[in-house]
Structures are given as structure tokens and as C-alpha cells.
A protein has these predicted regions:
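Conserved, structured core segments of small domains
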Residues: 1-106
Length: 106
């Protein structure tokens, strides 16, 4: 019997803060966020992720979408809190929406 806990998949939508400096905070920490995302992807935690945009024309980043494999919603919250975007104050953690998620098999 395996000691590894079952993992579940979650879809996360999280908005950035909306103050005047929010986008500059996001951009200043972006490389650290991407490095952490790469590490989490290699570890099998992050399935997919990307920026939410205000529009396709303007392409201003206003938040993030993530598909995360974790043991629980609580673990997802812990992962979000430790992300460079959250630590630097780019993400507004109060807006995080976490949904149980199943990918279509087609």
C-alpha cells in the first residue's frame, strides 16, 4: 500500500490587486514567479497556468488562472500564499476562487 496521499486537481482563478502600482509589482517579480511555477510544474504540482487579461486588444495582466494538483483545498491556499506574486502583493488572495476540477478525456 502506498503512503502517498491521493492528489486532486483544482482550477484556481485569482485577481491581481487593483491599485495604481499593482501591475508594476507583478512585473517586478514575474521572473521569480515563473521560476517557482517551473519548479512546481516539474514536481507535478502545477498542471497549467497563465495570465488573465483585461482584453485581447490591451493585453494588460489582471490576474492568473492555474490548474493545480494538491491533496486538499487548504494545500492549494498554502501554495498560493507562498507564490512570489502573493508575497510581493501582486495577487489579491481575497479573490482566489478554488474549484475542484476534472479534465475532459478526449
Amino acid at each position: 500500500m502506498s503512503a502517498t496521499p491521493a492528489k486532486y486537481t483544482f482550477l484556481v482563478l485569482i485577481d491581481d490587486h487593483t491599485d495604481a502600482d499593482a501591475l508594476s509589482r507583478r512585473m517586478s517579480i514575474r521572473q521569480a514567479h515563473l521560476a517557482e511555477a517551473t519548479r512546481r510544474r516539474q514536481a507535478g504540482i502545477l498542471v497549467s497556468g497563465g495570465a488573465l487579461l483585461d482584453s485581447h486588444e490591451r493585453r494588460t495582466m489582471v490576474g492568473s488562472s492555474l490548474i493545480i494538483r494538491a491533496e486538499s483545498e487548504q494545500q492549494v491556499l498554502e501554495l498560493l500564499r507562498a507564490d512570489p506574486y502573493a508575497v510581493a502583493g501582486a495577487w489579491n488572495l481575497d479573490t482566489a476562487r478554488i474549484y475542484p476540477y476534472v479534465e475532459a478525456d478526449f
